[in-house]
């Protein structure tokens, strides 16, 4: 008998279904029935080492067709996704853009 639930199990409990996962990241989706949209959360590896976590409406793209609309995460959701980043080895403390 297991005592603790995995991060993926906890994310599933709050509606996030894992779409894919590999060494370069993971992707999750959940449907918001109140506002009728799909929220997607991506954890992606970047060659720079500044790996990213982004949450957005998967179907809504901006007028210039260069990006999606951001969807916020609660503190609990962010905590779970940060744990997932750490599990994948994609959590880094590097911040900002060098230049």
Q: Language-model segments: what does each one mean?
A:
Residues 2-6, 24-40, 44-99:
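Intrinsically disordered, low-complexity regulatory regions enriched in serine/threonine/proline
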Residues 2-20:
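Amphipathic alpha-helical segments
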């Amino acid at each position: 008998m297991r005592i603790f639930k995995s991060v993926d199990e906890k994310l599933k409990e709050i509606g996030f279904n894992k779409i894919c996962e590999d060494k370069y990241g993971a992707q999750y989706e959940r449907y918001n029935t109140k506002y009728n949209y799909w929220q997607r959360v991506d954890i992606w590896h970047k060659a720079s080492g500044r790996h990213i976590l982004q949450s957005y409406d998967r179907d809504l793209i901006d007028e210039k067709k260069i990006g999606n609309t951001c969807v916020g995460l609660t503190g609990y959701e962010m905590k779970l996704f940060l744990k997932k980043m750490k599990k994948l080895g994609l959590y880094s403390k590097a911040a900002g853009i060098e230049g």
